């Protein structure tokens, strides 16, 4: 049914669909096996929705090596939360990413390492990758790691992170990568929840010219965690004096010398877990998202091939970290499944200067560049002059990931980086989806600046009215984005908490998968992503739970209550703003330095930011902490965050209906506090 009250997708009215530029087609190595135009996409998409059994069985056999064939393509339903794909089929992820390419073309580059210091760059071939993966797998096997065990990986974006992941799954074990920017406490929470007995890390990391003391963080986080019996440590910097606990800590290079150069992979059931990846949840506690082997690998391979138009001769550059899903799917699994070199980038776009990305593209003749809008906003603001110094003509496809990209930034990206010669693929997907949900297929689907265009094969996308829960038919509608049927790469569960999985994704709208994002579908059926509709903030493409940040802040002994909201930010997409009310009599504006009983506002803010950095990580730090007397609440005691979000967005004249507030009198004081503590500092 079409609901008249739903707004039209206004920004789409003047957006013109664009065909791929001529340069894109001329620079393609070949067209065999790819989608040639939108009519072919529509035909195949229709088949993928109406006859998924035939469609996905053909693709699974084409793109993956199976040790034993699957007997049934799919089973289960969204409503029951019991989805399974490729039942009884057996395969190994490490074999599919490494062995088959090493046997066919051992000297072909597999991992192109771009180190923090460019003097440390090197390349690993598929043949060498097989040897190194086998040796690390041999170490883990000697320690008793077996099929179904979890192994935690706390490494920066270096080849050893990819090698460790592939070594774990070679044994049929489950990797749980923890982003190396997370604090000791966050690492501990994830290691304990996953039940990991082995942790893989390094002595130190290097990022932006700075040293990150990773082994020290691991030691702090795992202090008293008796379940961890072994820690494998890669020597990244070689700094002397790294503490090593006898019987628990072992150097990777010393242990690798004891192992054979080839270890056979363990065949896994298609539904065996491949990895856990913790993501922010609206309840505050991180969720260990479970992805399984067969379906996830197919999603990674298919989307990399068809969305990005990837050919064997290409070089793929994902400027993302394996600590997040983008690094998993499009820096590791997608490219390596297709036998394509992947660039492993350890540093930042600003180190040693803003030409770093473009030197990488020029040096390795990268054909694909995939990055979050945050990085492009930064370069647009302060690093644009560097772009023209480099030859970027090898690029054919530009990707955007992690958050919606504005039409203006899309145009800049297309013109300045692509020289109007590339296809820009704005992709929408999630940790839970495993691979792209909605994205243009380069060269086949015309693009529109600001739109993620059309659903990928098998993604039966729809728009739901958030009030009635009824699907909204037709075009030019707005609502909540959902998916009507299962797809191979979707997450299967939350680790040790399947009820939470069903409650979070399947129960909000029974019979549908709830993405948590709002969206519009324009007059052409193209999708426009609006952002989160739940209590999750997207900062620089990283999803952060507002509840987790609130729980961290309220741990401060003199904080009474706190509410965290996300607002639009020119650089990071969204920014974290924290409203904090204090216990009576705690704060004193004129407290003398060193006063033990009171604290100044600036000192308190500093304390709270350090608390967030220490407990969660620097990337979760609030942009501003606003101290208030009280928070706006309904008569049932619920904090009205939409009011705080409007105030922090400088939209106090658009607060809407406040009749349900029990303490509407606090609103003017909050507006004043925001004026003095946030807006005044921005001027």
Swiss-Prot record:
InterPro entries xrefs: Ac_CoA_lig, ACAS_N, AMP-bd_C, AMP-bd_C_sf, AMP-binding_CS, AMP-dep_synth/lig_dom, ANL_N_sf
Residues reported to bind ATP: 402-404, 426-431, 517, 532, 543
Alphabetic keyword roster: ATP-binding, Ligase, Nucleotide-binding
PROSITE patterns found in the cross-reference section: AMP_BINDING
Gene Ontology biological process terms in this record: acetyl-CoA biosynthetic process from acetate
E.C. designation(s): 6.2.1.1
The organism's place on the tree of life at top rank: Eukaryota
GO molecular function, one term: ATP binding
EC class (word): ligase
SUPFAM superfamilies: Acetyl-CoA synthetase-like
CDD domains: ACS (cd05966)
Signal peptide (UniProt feature, chain positions): none
Binding site for CoA: 207-210, 326, 540, 613
One Gene Ontology cellular component: nucleolus
Transmembrane segments: none
Pfam families, per the entry: ACAS_N (PF16177), AMP-binding (PF00501), AMP-binding_C (PF13193)
Catalytic activity: acetate + ATP + CoA = acetyl-CoA + AMP + diphosphate
NCBIfam families, per database record: Ac_CoA_lig_AcsA, PRK00174.1
Protein name: Acetyl-coenzyme A synthetase 2
């Amino acid at each position: 049914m079409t609901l008249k009250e739903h707004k039209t997708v206004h920004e789409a009215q003047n957006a013109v669909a664009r065909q791929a530029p001529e340069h894109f087609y001329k620079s393609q190595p070949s067209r065999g096996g790819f989608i040639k135009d939108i009519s072919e996409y529509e035909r195949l998409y229709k088949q993928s929705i109406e006859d998924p059994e035939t469609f996905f069985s053909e693709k699974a056999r084409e793109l993956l090596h199976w040790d034993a064939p699957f007997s049934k393509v799919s089973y289960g339903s969204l409503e029951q939360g019991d989805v399974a794909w490729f039942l009884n089929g057996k395969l190994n992820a490490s074999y599919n990413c490494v062995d088959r390419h090493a046997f066919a073309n051992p000297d072909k580059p597999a991992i192109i390492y771009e180190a923090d210091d460019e003097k440390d760059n090197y390349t690993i071939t598929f043949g060498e990758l097989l040897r190194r993966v086998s040796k690390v797998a041999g170490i883990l096997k000697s320690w008793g790691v077996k099929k179904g065990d979890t192994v935690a990986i706390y490494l920066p974006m270096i080849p050893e992170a990819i090698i460790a992941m592939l070594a774990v799954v070679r044994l049929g074990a489950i990797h749980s990568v923890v982003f190396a920017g997370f604090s000791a406490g966050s690492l501990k929470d994830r290691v304990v929840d996953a039940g990991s007995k082995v942790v893989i890390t390094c002595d130190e990391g290097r990022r932006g010219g700075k040293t990150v003391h990773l082994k020290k963080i691991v030691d702090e986080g795992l202090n008293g965690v008796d379940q961890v019996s072994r820690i494998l440590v890669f020597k990244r910097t070689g700094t002397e004096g790294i503490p090593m606990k006898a019987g628990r800590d072992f150097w990777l290079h010393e242990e690798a010398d004891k192992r054979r150069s080839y270890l056979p992979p363990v065949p896994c059931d298609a539904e065996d877990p491949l990895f856990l990846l913790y993501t922010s949840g609206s309840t505050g506690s991180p969720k260990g998202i479970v992805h399984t082997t067969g379906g996830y690998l197919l999603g990674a391979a298919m989307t990399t091939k068809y969305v990005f138009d990837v050919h064997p001769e290409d070089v793929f550059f994902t400027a993302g970290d394996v600590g997040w899903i983008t690094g998993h799917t499009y820096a590791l699994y997608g490219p390596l499944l297709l036998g394509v070199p992947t660039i492993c980038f350890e540093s930042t776009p600003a180190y040693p200067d803003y030409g770093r990305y473009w030197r990488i593209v020029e040096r390795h003749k990268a054909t694909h560049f995939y990055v979050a809008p945050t990085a492009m906003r930064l370069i647009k603001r302060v690093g644009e002059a560097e772009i023209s110094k480099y030859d970027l003509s090898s690029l054919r496809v530009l990707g955007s990931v992690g958050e919606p990209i504005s039409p203006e930034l899309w145009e800049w990206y297309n013109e300045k980086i692509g020289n109007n010669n590339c296809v820009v693929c704005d992709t929408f997907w999630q940790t839970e989806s495993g691979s792209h949900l909605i994205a243009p297929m380069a060269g086949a689907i015309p693009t529109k600046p600001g739109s993620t265009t059309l659903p990928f094969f098998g993604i039966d996308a729809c728009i739901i009215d958030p009030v009635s829960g009824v699907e909204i038919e037709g075009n030019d509608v707005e609502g909540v984005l959902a998916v009507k049927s299962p797809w191979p790469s979707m997450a299967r569960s939350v680790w040790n908490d399947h009820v939470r999985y069903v409650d979070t994704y399947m129960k909000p709208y029974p019979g549908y998968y709830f993405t948590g994002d709002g969206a519009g579908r324009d007059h052409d059926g193209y999708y426009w992503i609006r952002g989160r509709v739940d209590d999750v903030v997207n900062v620089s493409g990283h999803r952060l739970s507002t509840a987790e940040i609130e729980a961290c802040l309220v741990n401060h002994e003199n904080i009474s209550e706190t509410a965290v909201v996300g607002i639009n930010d020119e650089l990071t997409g969204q920014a974290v703003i924290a409203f904090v009310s204090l216990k009576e009599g705690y704060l004193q504006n004129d407290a003398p330095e060193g006063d033990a009983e009171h604290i100044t506002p600036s000192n308190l803010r500093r304390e709270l930011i350090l608390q967030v950095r220490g407990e969660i990580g620097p990337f979760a730090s609030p942009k501003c902490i606003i101290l208030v007397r009280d928070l706006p609440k309904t008569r049932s005691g619920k904090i009205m965050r939409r009011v705080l979000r409007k105030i922090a967005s400088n939209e106090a004249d658009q607060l809407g209906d406040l009749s349900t507030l029990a303490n509407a009198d606090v609103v003017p004081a909050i507006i004043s506090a925001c004026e003095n503590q946030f807006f005044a500092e921005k001027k």
